[in-house]
Amino acid sequence: MPTLHTPRRFYLLSVLILLSAMLFTHCGGGGGGDTNGTTSSGGASGASGASGAGGTTTGSGPASGAGGGGATGSGSAGTGMSSGGTAMAATHDVLTYHNDIARTGQNLNETVLTPANVNTTTFGKVGFFAVDGKVDAQPLFVESLAIAGGTHNVLYVVTEHDSVYALDADSGTPLWQVSMLGAGETPSDDLGCGQITREIGITSTPVIDRSRGAHGTIFLVAMSKDASGGYHQRVHALDLASGTEVLNGPTEVAASYPGNGANSSNGRVVFAPAAYAERAGLLLLGGVVYTTWTSHCDEGAYTGWIMGYSADSLQQTAVLNVTPNGSGGAIWMSGAGPASDGASIYLLDANGTFDTTLNSGGMPAQGNFGNAFLKLGTAGGLAVADYFAMSSTVQESKADEDLGSGGALVLPDVTDANGVVQHLALGTGKDDIVYVVNRDSMGKFNAAGDQIYQEIQEQLRGGEFGMPAYFNGRVYFGSVNDNLKAFTLTNALLSTAPTAQTRMAFAYPGTTPSISANGSANGIVWAAENGNMAALHAFDPATLAELYNSNQMGTRDQFGAGNKFITPMITNGKVYVGTTNGVAVFGLLKG
């Protein structure tokens, strides 16, 4: 069972709070691109410019779990669609990857940070919260939580050492810490590969539901290795105020699915925990926590899995394999979480088997959807409802130029020149082509040429290892060795060339931008730069002129080596950046 470490001065009060409440309530796919953790920083950042109880089922996708509660989000408004915020979400909460289930990356409730005060004179590093391992997942934030004998703004941080921390978001004071390791277990080894190194514990961004349980619940996936050499993947649900396991968790991840693909037996492909890692962020939608699985260092026979777990019970409620009669097709998206419009799920699948022979409905005849932009239906279980695959998808998979290195973004509803409301999503991967799909008719596969809403070529370079962000009619991309670029959305079409770009370029793995703003005003585009000396950057959203970077003042704001696939999290006047050994915190300087 997990071990709980609570600071002494808070322990008794925390237990009393919990007891009182109880009286009233019950990768692969990444291919060659997912490699070493840090690179040279470049010159751009200078002054210039144990098994769980029951609940796991196997099968071909039983009915999706019951239970109320929508998806979680940051509470931000103005995206033109439901943000999925829970009923109890506070103004500054950040409860899921990239702020909302559409994965727009925008926090529209930031009233402290503005373009006028984000500069080297008034803004900088205000703290560093040390933890016991790498922070690959985006930190999450809960405002005004009753915890540890008081009310705190709480930062939730997970590490590759299989630890979960609840920290006071302002001071960094530990409120509780819990380990996900069972007796005699360690985090997984990295199998001598640099994809996730040096240990693998909790890689993906968790998801929080404040309305579930006595104090709210954080859901996460942790990987471990036991003393006999066996690997485990488990879904956990922890009480926000105490860190104790709830919902009879954890649940051991196990699954099979009809098919004769990689690692199949007797007509079913089987999920082998040692072969997989949970890289992509979790999605909470309709009372179900969705997990998506990538290969563990591209070792062994693997396929593309999506699984759903009830947010009420942690029982497995849905299983889908998108390459059941083939191989590959893992889902990793450089850490981005699957996106949703509140009903369906959108994701980019990595290189793997794709059937160019289609059935009468235009679907791959053997059910293999490797290297494709997928729309998943959730009613009655998981199923591919629609998809788009490039006419060159097979060739791109063979060349490791797959789509799955990037994440999908659901755009707000937009109106075209004819007054028609369009429902769009977009994504790009290693081929640097921006694919904009109509969510109502994505285009499927056509060997003669792509049948797609819009396609923009030759404007990005280096491959996308992350995902874009959206704000005020602009979409921002940060691909490898490329400038951060803005494309403007007009009459439901993206500009065919960037309308603004930064002067600097971002080395591998590029950057996943995030946005802070107060509604449509005081917008700032934030981006983390990887490297031996990493950096946090802030840009004007219209011009992408640099407002600030953390290397401009010598060592004052520096925070050491970078982590790949890091997404800055901005809320309540602070910017939180995951690092190799903690979280760097930025805000307004005192005095």
Predicted ranges, named:
Residues R9-L19:
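Sec-dependent N-terminal signal peptides
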Residues N446-R461, A497-R503:
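Inter-blade linker and blade-boundary elements of WD-repeat/beta-propeller domains
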Residues L23-H26:
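C-terminal motif of bacterial Sec signal peptides marking the signal peptidase cleavage site
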